Amino acid sequence: MLFEATHTHPATMCPLKTTEGKASLKQLFSDQNIKKAGIKLTAAYFSCPKDTALDHKGFFTIDADNAVTVTKFFGTMAVDVRPIQTLKEVAKML
């Protein structure tokens, strides 16, 4: 099942601004950690560091058994997790 996990953080607290934050993101999204979590990361996009707005956003499309698995993967990183489907699947219902 596909899920979209969206993360928002203040630009002033962007993890890409610190060595520790960069290392944490690198570890979280490592192939080993993704495999261990039992998910498939199908797409990931960040508005930072290009975004100069007050808040930065991260968008993660994940294939997983359920939303709980997705939330657990992110640990202490706050995410809004929602089930999604492709536009092609939605179009079939129109």
Language model region names:
Residues M1-T52, H56, D65-A67, E89-L94:
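Short S/T/G/P-rich N-terminal loop/turn motif that feeds into the first structured element of a domain
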Residues F60-T61:
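Conserved RNP beta-strands of RNA recognition motif
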Residues V79-A91:
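Conserved short beta-strand edge segments in small beta-sheet-based binding/regulatory domains
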Residues V70-A78:
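Short amphipathic alpha-helices in soluble, non-transmembrane regions
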